[in-house]
Amino acid sequence: MTRKMPTLVRPTHNGERYEITNPTAMPKAAGFLWNQKMMIQITCRGFATAQFMQPEPAKYAYAPNIEAKTFMQPEPNYYAHHPGRFVYIKDEETGRLFSAPYEPVRAPHDRFVFSAGKTDVFWVIESMGIRVEMTMGLPTHHVAELWTIKVKNLSSRPRKLSVTPYFPIGYMSWMNQSAEWNHNLNGIVASCVTPYQKAADYFKNKYLKDKTYFLCDVPPDSWEASQQAFEGEGGLHNPSALQERNLSGSDARYETPTAAVQYKIALGTGEQQEYRFLFGPAHDEAEIGAMRSKYLSKEGFEQTAADYAAYMARGRGCLHVETPDKDLDNFINNWLPRQVYYHGDVNRLTTDPQTRNYLQDNMGMNYIKPEVSRRAFLTAIAQQEATGAMPDGILLVEGAELKYINQVPHTDHCVWLPVTLEAYLNETGDYSLLKEKVPSANGDKLTVFERFCRAMDWLLKSRDHRGLSYIAQGDWCDPMNMVGYKGKGVSGWLTLATAFSLNIWAKVCDHEGETDLAKRFREGADACNAAANEHLWDGEWFARGITDDNVVFGIKEDKEGRIWLNPQSWSILSGAASPEQIDKMLPQIDSHLNTPYGIQMFGPPYTKMREDVGRVTQKAIGSAENAAVYNHAGIFFIHSLYELGAQQDRAFTLLRQMLPGPTDTDYIQRGQLPIYIPNYYRGAWKECPRTAGRSSQLFNTGTVSWVYRCIIEGLCGLRGDGEGLLIRPQLPSSWNSMKVTREFRGATFNVDIRRGNVKEVTVRNGDKVLPAPHVKDIEPGQTYNLTVTIP
């Protein structure tokens, strides 16, 4: 009888967790946890990337060499000495060795489970008749990792084992680094001085958390604080220290520190030993002692887990669906709102989020905590420049500075004000926000409404003689940095996005009784659309832009970068594209950009530098913005299809492709668990099929707020307006029904959607048929049971 192989990827605990049962099939598959001060992403094999805020991002476990400070990178490369969390198990009688979760020994295992949960990460590894269980959790308010390690004897004989947790600390500082065992704290404490050269930086760095601690609840039998002493000549797969009777009790003196502790145990058949550890940064020993007292006990771990579960529950979202696609249900109900919550809760753990990211990430909070979205508008608009322009980044803490890409001038940030406000108003109906007076650093004190008008005026002024929007050194596409660096280049996408934004704002002006302003902004939108049609329509799609030297690009004649998705999506949203133009565009999009893994941002990819477009053309073929399945661009297209109507099959197909699975083949190709949407999957499907579909593994993306919005307002068709809730579901043709529970303005809507013999959507509230698919006069606290029949 052959043993049935476990399913590679599976949901458990009613979808609250996802498991993977093989550490080699998807080696980069990972889970992530966060609180408002830290984040950690950890792979199924045990490699980890963690950072915390003080207030700028910092590390407490480092690479083994000097590490560049940078933003989170896609497609991380893992290697033997990459930071990670491991435990070695050695049979003291036979000398055999394995490690959990899988690295660094990579020994064969009898059972492997990596379980990514919403509130913790968990492993079960069985090898050599021994079971190891590892659990990692976080506190709600502090920077620390809480680890539980259980070791059980599954064999039929007593076992003598050494259990050696190994948490490498890495190269901390070229100025000063050390580590030693601290008897008072019962753990290893590594210390460093953050490198600096300017005198002023001494005071800036004085109170940084320059210590990393690894604390044990049970005193170990021996320890190692020096990486070289632990690893020796054996290498990490068979460290020299584990070939000795005990660890040597080393320290590290301007040497690379590590944290390895060893327990010698004897386990009878079925016996188990449990250990708890605390790993994190601190400023001094007093802080470490306080963390130990608060957390490092069984009761402390249990209370922390309960508190963290309550913290995560606050991000549960406003939607629950039952559809024919159970994997999609699981993602929508459990994992999508979690990722949306992450973005709005911590703003990607940066002190200067890009303005467009900040506004779009907080757009998702409309469906979780609308007050957070409201506050974000006030924070952002207070930093408006005197010209009406928005800055490239929003500063969130005192002393923060614009860094990285925010030092490069982009021209699109004003566009996102009305675009994201529309979702806020749809969800809350809170037009009082517009009357809030907001002072700025310029000394003026204007209402939100007045500031938005200034932003729209800035967009209208920032156009050339043709009426096309200047691009400077980038628009939404950050690396399109050389189209307009001489001051003349224009963006086709931004011209259309400006029209869309102006039209949204004109509706708001109408609502506020400002009909003259509404007329002016609509005329501006019409002018942008007309300019796009005159100068950018290429017969079957809209061009991406015109360079400083007056070269139109993103057209049929281009061998690379021929057709871009964003201009087509936003021409639908802005109204620039007529029905006839849309009929021409959609087949071209299908032909040029569709892949089995979603829709490419453009195609074909660039294979060499194009100096009048910029560094986007230098990116690796099919990666990031160079013709990847860039999900943010994809969701704009999906949103435009739902707004257009009668495109639900095309929209749903693309929406579903954003999620890995459900086949093992798809999971393996993407290499990612279906617990988040990454910023991209590799594109260039025709040119580089071997790598196409590979996940970036980067969960920071503006995609997810839009995905949640598209599911709520598009697929489910439950969109708010000034009077109540509009009901216009857009089910794919393969579905005959779905059920939705939607929380909206304090009320609960239970919606049963079914196909029937009707020509238009009909809604029954209890026994009453509504005159239109529109629920008005909604009462908070009430439950509405709606039966919806669709054609």
Curated annotation (Swiss-Prot):
| Enzyme Commission designation | 2.4.1.321
Q: Which InterPro entries match?
A: 6-hairpin_glycosidase_sf, 6hp_glycosidase-like_sf, Gal_mutarotase_sf_dom, GH36_catalytic, GH94_Enzymes, GH94N_CBAP, Glyco_hydro_65_N_sf, Glyco_hydrolase_94
Q: Where are the transmembrane segments?
A: none
Annotated active site residues, numbered on this chain, are 478 (proton donor)
| Organism superkingdom | Eukaryota
Q: Name one GO biological process term.
A: cellulose catabolic process
Check the record and name the CDD domains matching this protein: GH94N_NdvB_like
* Molecular-function GO term, any one: hexosyltransferase activity
The answer to whether UniProt assigns keyword ATP-binding to this entry is no
Q: Which Gene3D superfamilies does UniProt cross-reference here?
A: 1.50.10.10, Glycoside hydrolase, family 65, N-terminal domain (2.70.98.40), Maltose phosphorylase, domain 3 (2.60.420.10)
Q: Which family, according to UniProt?
A: Belongs to the glycosyl hydrolase 94 family. Cellobionic acid phosphorylase subfamily.
> What name appears for this protein in its UniProt entry?
Cellobionic acid phosphorylase
Q: Which organism is it from?
A: Neurospora crassa (strain ATCC 24698 / 74-OR23-1A / CBS 708.71 / DSM 1257 / FGSC 987)
